[in-house]
């Protein structure tokens, strides 16, 4: 089981999404639990590596336009939650 670490920007993203009431935050928690346990995500979540400045990060879809960007640090056994939000919010 991985240890979860959250970056400051992720915390702000979650707070903003929670406050808006537009997203079912239990979906995010479910994805995080699966990743924490080291389980593979279903193809519906389209997990994939990112490129360029994000090349050491992964992205998955919680909903069609709701993403989670994360990193797995195998040396420290950590799941690092980096960002969450829409394509337009994350990749400006």
Language model features with spans:
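Basic, Lys/Arg-enriched alpha-helical interface segments
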Residues: 1-64, 73-79, 88-92
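Short, charged interaction patches at domain edges and termini
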Residues: 70
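A short hydrophobic beta-strand segment most commonly corresponding to one strand
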Residues: 81-83
